[in-house]
A protein has these predicted regions:
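Aromatic "clamp/platform" in nucleotide-sugar-dependent glycosyltransferases that forms part
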Residues: 319
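Carbohydrate-associated surface elements
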Residues: 193, 215
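Conserved donor-binding/catalytic core segment of Leloir-type glycosyltransferases
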Residues: 228-247, 253-256
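Acceptor-binding helix/loop patch of EC 2.4 sugar-transfer enzymes
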Residues: 70-95, 134-178
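Nucleotide-activated donor-binding/catalytic signature segment of Leloir-type glycosyltransferases, i.e.
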Residues: 280-302
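Short alpha-helical donor nucleotide-sugar binding micro-motif in glycosyltransferases
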Residues: 298, 306-311
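Conserved acidic donor-binding segment of nucleotide-sugar-dependent glycosyltransferases
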Residues: 353-362
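Short hydrophobic beta-strand element within catalytic cores of glycosyltransferases
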Residues: 336-339
């Protein structure tokens, strides 16, 4: 096998949340183990990487590390010298947009020269800059799922006209992603369902989209043995990699509210972090279930596996999953699984989970 010089682009790569940094860590590690030279080019927050993998930091303004206007203004004013992309990033964020993908793509285009890499892997930025890079270097565009699905579910659960206006403004980058996706020569996605949705939502020929399912580290995600600990019969676990409607955490919280009187010892562990003062925290207060819920974040793979293995039931209440890692991880740990019958989840579970009809799921949320 020919050894390649591979560049991996990731516009943001938080190592413990959102999935992007975790994906970059795993794919770069495995490509290096195959003997390839791997360089990750990332915007902030930056990923954790294995030794021997180069990291090129491509900083923007990192405005979304805070939502305080004074802090954002300070970041902008302290940037010296300023480029057009810095001005664009600041003012688009100021009016409620999300400019990071576009500006990261422009910076990557200016950085990468024809002789730098044999191939470039893009981790779902789908930025205009990729079109120029593709003129001299082959690009494999990884699309986990079309972000149009996130927009759809946010709008579905938003009744405020003002809120709906800002949701549409935030997802303004989708027009760019649709245009760029059509022009990418090679697209990779982890499930048949994502292939269909990318084709439908982004107008991409399915023949251009290759399906390679993500793998589960079965050396780490394993059943618990008696020497390591014990299962708690009233302990339920779920994962919410982002505090957004798409992940469906509110359904599980409402279920805990209903079950706590029947099973006073019940406890839900959530792998993830809610937004401070956000919808999830408000819902927990409204349902008066804070004593039954705990959140855990910044966990290693081994720590996550232990949390799964100690639980009696795992729940995946997502409304959409391009590839549901929590589904596969729970099954690998031999934990009984309840999951929504949506998107890629049935592809992963086959008959080995209790699947909940999405219509019943949504009807309960609307009550």
């Amino acid at each position: 096998m020919k050894k390649l010089n591979i560049g991996i682009l990731s516009y943001r790569s938080a190592p413990f949340s959102g999935g992007q940094g975790i994906y970059v860590y795993e794919i770069s590690k495995l490509l290096k183990e195959l003997g390839h030279k791997v360089t990750v080019i990332s915007g902030p927050p930056y990923p954790h990487l294995e030794k021997g993998i180069d990291l090129i930091k491509l900083p923007g303004l990192n405005l979304f590390s805070t939502f305080n206007f004074k802090d954002r203004l300070k970041k902008f004013l302290h940037k010296r010298p300023k480029s057009f992309d810095d001005y664009y990033e600041f003012f688009v964020a100021l009016i409620g947009g999300f400019p990071e993908m576009k500006t990261f793509g422009n910076r990557a285009r200016n950085l990468i020269k024809p002789e730098d890499f044999d191939v470039v892997i893009d981790n779902q930025s789908l930025a205009y800059g990729l079109i120029d890079i593709q003129q001299h270097t082959p690009i494999l565009s990884v699309i986990h799922h079309p972000i149009s699905k996130d927009k759809y579910f946010e709008l579905l659960f938003s009744r405020s006209i003002i809120r709906r206006f800002f949701i549409k403004r935030w997802y303004g980058f989708l027009r760019m992603q649709k245009n760029v996706a059509k022009r990418m020569e090679y697209i990779l996605t982890p499930s048949k369902n994502s292939q269909i949705d990318i084709s439908n939502d982004f107008g991409v020929d399915k023949k251009k989209i290759t399906i390679i399912p993500n793998g589960i580290d079965s050396n780490t995600f394993t059943p618990l043995n008696s020497r390591e600990g014990f299962k708690n019969n009233f302990r339920i676990i779920t994962t919410a990699s982002a505090d957004v409607p798409l992940k469906g955490l509110s359904f599980t919280l409402r279920a805990i509210h209903y079950l706590k009187d029947l099973y006073p010892e019940i406890h839900l562990t959530v792998i993830g972090q809610p937004k401070s003062g956000g919808y999830t925290e408000r819902l927990i207060d409204e349902l008066d279930i804070s004593e039954y819920i705990s959140f855990k974040t910044n966990l290693s793979k081994a720590e996550i596996a232990f949390e799964y293995a100690c639980s009696s039931v795992a729940i995946v209440s997502s409304l959409y999953e391009g590839f549901g890692f929590p589904v596969g991880e729970a099954m690998a740990c031999n934990v009984p699984l309840i999951a929504t019958n949506v998107a890629s989840i049935p592809e992963i579970t086959s008959n080995y989970a209790t699947l909940i009809n999405k219509r019943l799921h949504l009807r309960y949320q609307m009550l």
